[in-house]
Amino acid sequence: MMFQSFFTAHPRLGQRLCLIFSLLSTAAFAQSPYFEITQKPAQVAVTTAHPMATEAALKMLQQGGSAIDAAIAAQLMLGLVESQSSGLGGGTFLMHWDAAQKSLTSLDGLAISPQKTTASLTTDVDGSQLPSASMGRGGRSAGVPGTLPLLAKAHAKFGKLSWPTLFVPAIEAASKGFPMPAYMHQILSAPTAAKDHADMLALYFDDAQKVKPVGTLIVNPDYAKTLQSIALKGPSAIWADGASTDFLAAVQRGYKPSLMTEEDLKSYPVEEREPLCGPYLRYRVCVMAPPSFGGVVVLQVLQMLAEKSNLGTDFNQPEFAHAFAEAGKLAQVDRRLYVADPAFFKVPAKALVSPAYVKQRAALIQTNTLPSYGPGLPEAMLAESSGQTLAQATAASSADATSQLAVVDAQGNAVSMTTTNNLNFGSRILVQGYVLNNAMTNFTTSPKPGEIAPNKMEPRKRPVTSMVPTMVFDEAGQLVTLGGSAGGGQIVDYVSANLVRMLANQLSPFEALAQGHISTALPNRVQLEKGTSAAQLAEALLAKGQKVEVVPMNSGMGFLKRAGNGWIGSADPRRDGVAWGFNPKP
């Protein structure tokens, strides 16, 4: 009954399933060793946001490639078939588990601000103020992309196959064409889509400026050419032979052009970061550290819920759903004040997720909601905050953007990767076959006089983000779960809730990802997913003083979970993704 109501609430899912089943029924797939892993475990496992990306990853693994090789091949394909969400013009977080070395690391490839950045996105170079409504898209909204440098660094550290091999599936698909995906079609079908996506008219729209129907073959020769150059000449080729000039010309068109320079493009720094880890029940949950605020929120929420163990872990019970919402509010208040790029602000990340501090915050959760919560004061900030007024970061967008993938290879190495253009189709600039991000919108607007804004715009800085690739380990140090989600600011709620469902309630990823969503990503409200069991909580939560909205929530989750000697997994049924795997021959 639960799944029936879910599918009734998501009628477009039928279109997506038809496309997936058509891929599954092809002779090539029928003869392949791949199979769907929602219930049947596989030793090698992949979940991505599109079947062609999952298949590209599996091809690398079948050739003896590493989890990193598979993730790179999947990302290159996602830049084609899910170009609204991620690609070479975006930013990426990657978490990697080396099974032999028992070593966990993460790479930060977020888009960064150019060197010539102004004080804020709405501040022009002469100091005059610009209309915020006009600055969310276009050249000035774009950050220096970091996805390709991250992929190159990951391959240098953990890759096994040759660099050109990883590009073969995406080049072939870009050259020969791919079927218009249902989810991309849905996004392009917004009432103003043709006007808003003028750079993409020839690619995705017909002569009447209508979105090409689902299943229509889409060919992207510019993307194929870009990939061929990078595959043969290496990552630096993306800016060689006049490509950087073409790129800069594209972002300097239109209202308030980008301030990016060629030096910005060619000197992008990938950061290797220590993951942030904390306890939940008998597990150790490891997440992306700042500038991800997602990691801080997820660890705080999980620990606060553990402190409220008397309420159980059933999201269909109003008492627990209320506690989840209140924990989310508390965590959001803290992150808006204290999380920023650690190169520019001393972020008290470990103090914010320490059990003692989180226990204090959990004690604030009452039977009924409070009108508002103030931020806490972790011990690490006592001296730092003296005499200072910190400006809170703005709330993150609730747009259903971004993409998530997870991979486990034959050696047990694993990748969880969240990758984004920020909002769908980012800046709405298409250059060399890929979409450019609009990550500059993630910085805080201009602070008031006397305030310090940790997330303010500064040269060569990373804005905060909700993205939170995650890995979970048991008491023996064995990796048991990995994944993450798309979905804008609501990512933190999607990930937190599904970790509760998989770890506390022992649901499979397939069961967990089909549950209805609850979110407090936007201030002073609780959002419940329309058409799901979560929406039925509205009356009970209203009685507890919550301001409730029942809305569609297209997440974009992807998780893998250990099952015996293999892995089961799922991609979010709200989008086009699939989770497949295979068992290597002895």
Positions of the model-derived regions?
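Extended C-terminal subregions enriched in glycine
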Residues: 411, 460-462, 495, 504-552
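Internal maturation/activation junctions in enzymes
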Residues: 308-420
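Short, small/polar residue-rich loop motifs at catalytic or cofactor-binding pockets
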Residues: 272, 399-402, 465-467
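Active-site rim segments in enzyme catalytic domains, especially the processed small/beta chain
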Residues: 80-87, 91-97, 101-106, 258-261, ...
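Bacterial N-terminal signal peptides
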Residues: 14-27
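N-terminal secretory signal peptides that target proteins for export/translocation
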Residues: 1-12
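Glycine-rich phosphate/pyrophosphate-binding beta-alpha loops
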Residues: 286-295, 402, 406, 416-428, ...
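Noncatalytic scaffold domains of N-terminal-nucleophile
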Residues: 31-55, 59, 67-240, 245-289, ...
